[in-house]
């Protein structure tokens, strides 16, 4: 999948695929690094990759829980959400 410029360029389904690829270590080492750096960059969440690797609270580390936490944090901080569709 081509990486996009902003989280608002992704549907939740598209972004879930990136999270799944990170969790499942899909691709070679460069692709894994690119996906993780992209995740950190576009989510802008202060916990960064810890959302996936060291989840806290109600986040069980599943792609759905990670997306839920990202959405809640972005909304609470006045940031754009995922593309509808």
From Swiss-Prot:
GO terms for biological process: bacteriocin immunity. CDD domains: Col_Im_like. The keyword Protein biosynthesis does not apply. Keywords: Bacteriocin immunity, Plasmid. Transmembrane segments: none annotated. Belongs to the colicins ColE2/ColE8/ColE9 and pyocins S1/S2 family. It comes from Escherichia coli. This is Colicin-E8 immunity protein. Gene3D superfamilies: Colicin E immunity protein. One of its GO terms (molecular function) is toxic substance binding. This protein is able to protect a cell, which harbors the plasmid ColE8 encoding colicin E8, against colicin E8, it binds specifically to the DNase-type colicin and inhibits its bactericidal activity. The lineage of its organism: Bacteria, Pseudomonadati, Pseudomonadota, Gammaproteobacteria, Enterobacterales. It comes from the Bacteria.
